[in-house]
UniProtKB/Swiss-Prot annotation:
Single Gene Ontology MF annotation: ATP binding
Entry's family note: Belongs to the ATPase alpha/beta chains family.
Native source organism of the sequence: Nitrosomonas eutropha (strain DSM 101675 / C91 / Nm57)
Subunit comment: F-type ATPases have 2 components, CF(1) - the catalytic core - and CF(0) - the membrane proton channel. CF(1) has five subunits: alpha(3), beta(3), gamma(1), delta(1), epsilon(1). CF(0) has three main subunits: a(1), b(2) and c(9-12). The alpha and beta chains form an alternating ring which encloses part of the gamma chain. CF(1) is attached to CF(0) by a central stalk formed by the gamma and epsilon chains, while a peripheral stalk is formed by the delta and b chains.
Protein's UniProt keywords contain Cytoplasm: no
Protein name per the record: ATP synthase subunit beta 1
The EC number(s) this enzyme carries: 7.1.2.2
Functional summary from the UniProt entry: Produces ATP from ADP in the presence of a proton gradient across the membrane. The catalytic sites are hosted primarily by the beta subunits.
Gene that this sequence comes from: atpD1
Cellular location(s): Cell inner membrane
């Protein structure tokens, strides 16, 4: 039986290959080009021995009649500890010029999600050291978190800070999948990890903006497969994806190239299924856990767009970054009224944490309602209680800002890691009026409440 086929049509990244009728490849089989490093992945069987494939690499120089060999297996990538500290592409090949990976085991990138009876739920909290996140939308170990934000509000910087904090404090293994992001960010990220001495605990998989859609669509699965392998060894792994929107976008490009009819806003008709297939694999089993943090670009700041809206349903916590808060110079620009977490429940985090978080939100919500009155009539028209509310809300707003370790180069102020206990103590004090006499500038860009008191002395 012949496993050789020949190219009959090339349209951009979509290549049609003809095989003898008894040797037709299965969907998702990997095909390799003779005398070239290019791999094709079968997407459809068109009939008469012809299969439609997506090129995982540049299709420049391909022409009809070229020979292709069916490997009779899916794309497999290296897994295990040899991948740590290395940068790989969608096929698991090294792109850091540091020689072969040398992995002993390989796994196919398409796998089924763990069965229902293998799953395990966890309510253990993962402390991030970022005040606003730990207070308002705490993360669960083995949970899924989305960082939602438009262009330029700080998704990648937040993600890098989370990786740095968790990698240093949590000291487990991490896998980072760069899906359709800027190559410069990938480079910065690599050096940031190197400087923080956590590179030997991170496996990096990149399919950046300049890559063909096939690479960007599959690179998330490559990273996920590596994370699953660590989980199946009984470890607790962190899996970072930047950016899940580009995964959807690559799916849209591939879908259009394959000739499928687009659905709402031009997205692929299989959007929910593609997203579900990826997200359902990111889960914790009885052997180990995957805690996933995903950056989600929000097109035109519209959270109802089909791509972010589909992602919402899969997450345990959502961190929403707001342009309005960023414009006030408050970073991280997390919107405390829009961000949510399933863990913010008195049975999970305790009464003290829950009540403090809710009171912070109520104070900020009251300030939001009063802002129109203040804009029209000024502060003098408010009742004494409302004036106090506004003053505390402005302090809370500023206290939610924090200097980041990864942003030291830009800000010049050293990063701060604030423990959850310290965070709750600080916000509780503001709400109870313990710091009513301290000017609001003292609360801006500091770590714990002790620093506020120190800073306030310099204003006197």
């Amino acid at each position: 039986m012949s496993h050789q086929g020949k190219i009959v049509q090339c349209i951009g990244a979509v290549i049609d290959v003809e095989f003898a009728s008894e040797g037709i490849p299965k969907v998702y089989d990997a095909l390799v080009m003779e005398g070239s490093e290019l791999t094709l992945e079968v997407q459809q069987q068109l009939g008469d021995g012809v299969v439609r494939t997506i090129a995982l690499g540049s299709s420049d120089g391909l022409r009809r009649g070229m020979m292709v060999t069916n490997t009779q297996k899916q794309i497999s990538v290296p897994v295990g500890t040899k991948t740590l500290g290395r940068i790989m592409d969608v096929l698991g090949r090294p792109i850091d010029e540091m020689g072969e990976i040398g992995a002993e085991s390989f796994m196919p990138i398409h796998r089924t999600a763990p069965a229902f009876d293998e799953l395990s739920a966890s309510t253990e909290l993962l402390e991030t050291g970022i005040k606003v996140i730990d207070l308002i939308c705490p993360f669960a170990k083995g949970g899924k978190v989305g960082l939602f934000g438009g262009a330029g509000v700080g998704k990648t910087v937040n993600m890098m800070e989370l990786i740095r904090n968790i990698a240093i404090e949590h000291s487990g293994y991490s896998v980072f999948a760069g899906v359709g992001e800027r190559t410069r960010e990938g480079n910065d990220f690599y050096h940031e990890m190197k400087d923080s001495n956590v590179l030997d605990k991170v496996a990096l998989v990149y399919g950046q903006m300049n890559e063909p859609p096939g690479n960007r669509l599959r690179v998330a699965l490559t990273g996920l497969t590596m994370a699953e392998a660590f989980r199946d060894e009984g470890r607790d792994v962190l899996f970072f994806v930047d950016n899940i929107y580009r995964y959807t976008l690559a799916g849209t490009e591939v879908s259009a190239l394959l000739g499928r009819m687009p659905s709402a806003v031009g997205y692929q008709p299989t959007l929910a299924e593609e997203m579900g297939r990826l997200q359902e694999r990111i889960t914790s089993s009885k052997t180990g856990s995957i805690t996933s943090i995903q950056a989600v670009y929000v097109p035109a700041d519209d959270l109802t767009d089909p791509s972010p809206a589909t992602t919402f349903g899969h997450l345990d916590a959502t961190v929403v970054l707001s342009r309005d808060i960023a414009s006030l110079g408050i970073y991280p620009a997390v919107d405390p009224l829009d961000s949510t977490s399933r863990q913010l429940d008195p049975l999970v985090v305790g009464e003290d944490h829950y009540n403090t978080a809710r009171e912070v939100q109520q104070t900020l919500q009251r300030y939001k309602e009063l802002r129109d009155i203040i804009a029209i009539l000024g502060m003098d028209e408010l009742s004494p209680e409302d004036k106090l509310s506004v003053s505390r809300a402005r302090k809370i707003q500023r206290f939610l800002s924090q200097p980041f370790f990864v942003a030291e180069v830009f800000t010049g102020s050293p990063g701060k890691y604030v423990s959850l206990k310290e965070t709750i103590k600080g916000f509780k004090g503001i709400i109870n009026g313990e710091y009513d006499d301290i000017p609001e500038q003292a609360f801006y860009m500091v770590g714990g409440i002790e620093e506020v008191l120190e800073k306030a002395k310099s204003f006197q």
